[in-house]
């Protein structure tokens, strides 16, 4: 080892490490706040014709299903499809909302892979 090289962990590396820890703490605090925000959200999904409405949280937790009387007249198979379509719509919107919120949280932090 040549004089002055040390173990490659000079002041510059320590500063980088401190910055990385600070970013991690920012992300952790933001993630906790985002988790609470997502839990409080109510995202609606609908079937075609809005005969069935599903409400989910921002964490994809189902909250309620509302079925209009006209949907009941469609029969079991079609009603099942309407409920499935409304669930998929709510899920898609919920995951898109979560993805957007995560991008907002991590933007500007220059985190690799995010």
UniProtKB/Swiss-Prot annotation:
Keywords: Cytoplasm, DNA-binding. The keyword Repeat does not apply. It holds the Pfam family YbaB_DNA_bd. The keyword Cytoplasm applies. It comes from the Bacteria. GO terms for molecular function: DNA binding. Binds to DNA and alters its conformation. May be involved in regulation of gene expression, nucleoid organization and DNA protection. This is Nucleoid-associated protein PCC8801_2554. It comes from Rippkaea orientalis (strain PCC 8801 / RF-1) (Cyanothece sp. (strain PCC 8801)). The lineage of its organism: Bacteria, Bacillati, Cyanobacteriota, Cyanophyceae, Oscillatoriophycideae.
């Amino acid at each position: 080892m040549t004089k002055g090289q040390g173990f490659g962990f000079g002041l510059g590396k320590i500063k980088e490490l401190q910055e990385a820890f600070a970013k991690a703490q920012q992300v952790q605090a933001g993630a906790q706040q985002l988790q609470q925000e997502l839990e409080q959200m109510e995202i609606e999904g609908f079937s075609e014709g809005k005969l069935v409405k599903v409400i989910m949280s921002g964490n994809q937790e189902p909250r309620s299903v509302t079925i209009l009387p006209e949907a009941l007249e469609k029969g079991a198979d079609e009603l099942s499809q309407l409920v499935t379509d409304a669930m998929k719509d709510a899920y898609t919107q919920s995951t898109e909302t979560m993805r957007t919120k995560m991008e907002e949280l991590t933007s500007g932090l220059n985190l690799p892979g995010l």
